[in-house]
Amino acid sequence: MEEAEKASQPHAGTALAFDFGEKRIGVAIGNLELGLAHPLVTLSNKNKEECLKSIARLMDEWKPVLLVVGLPVHADGTEHELTRRSRRFAHRLQARFGIRTVLEDERYTSISASSALDEASVRGRRQKQVLDQIAAQLILQSYFDQRNATT
């Protein structure tokens, strides 16, 4: 994170993170001062308008000062179609809600989330229900860790 970008980030308040997917969007919440992220909810993304209404309810309830959207890229850092869709999603969030929105590299978060859930004996249907919000938690925690490492 560049110094100018770091200076423009809020330092207090609530952050919401999103693991964007075609079918589901995982959401996590965290406190900027504490630098701790927690899974929150998984939203269905089958009906885009209903999904945006659900996100609007989360905005009203949690009053975030920052949004973090996972940016999926190939292992070598090259972009693909879901990268572009995630960027569009982030731009829509910022335009619709007027809240600073940043992108965070999400390489391997779903794999890490699945491994953590396997270790906790969460498998099958239950894992599918929470996998995306755990991935969002890892995205947000990565953002916090990187931010704190540069301060």
UniProtKB/Swiss-Prot annotation:
One of its GO terms (biological process) is rRNA 5'-end processing. Its EC number is 3.1.-.-. GO terms for molecular function: nuclease activity. It comes from the Bacteria. It is found in: Cytoplasm. Keywords: Cytoplasm, Hydrolase, Nuclease, Ribosome biogenesis. InterPro entries: RNaseH-like_sf (IPR012337), YqgF (IPR005227), YqgF/RNaseH-like_dom (IPR006641), YqgF/RNaseH-like_dom_sf (IPR037027). Gene3D superfamilies: YqgF/RNase H-like domain (3.30.420.140). GO terms for cellular component: cytosol. NCBIfam families: RNAse_H_YqgF. Belongs to the YqgF nuclease family. Could be a nuclease involved in processing of the 5'-end of pre-16S rRNA. This is Putative pre-16S rRNA nuclease. It comes from Nitrosospira multiformis (strain ATCC 25196 / NCIMB 11849 / C 71).
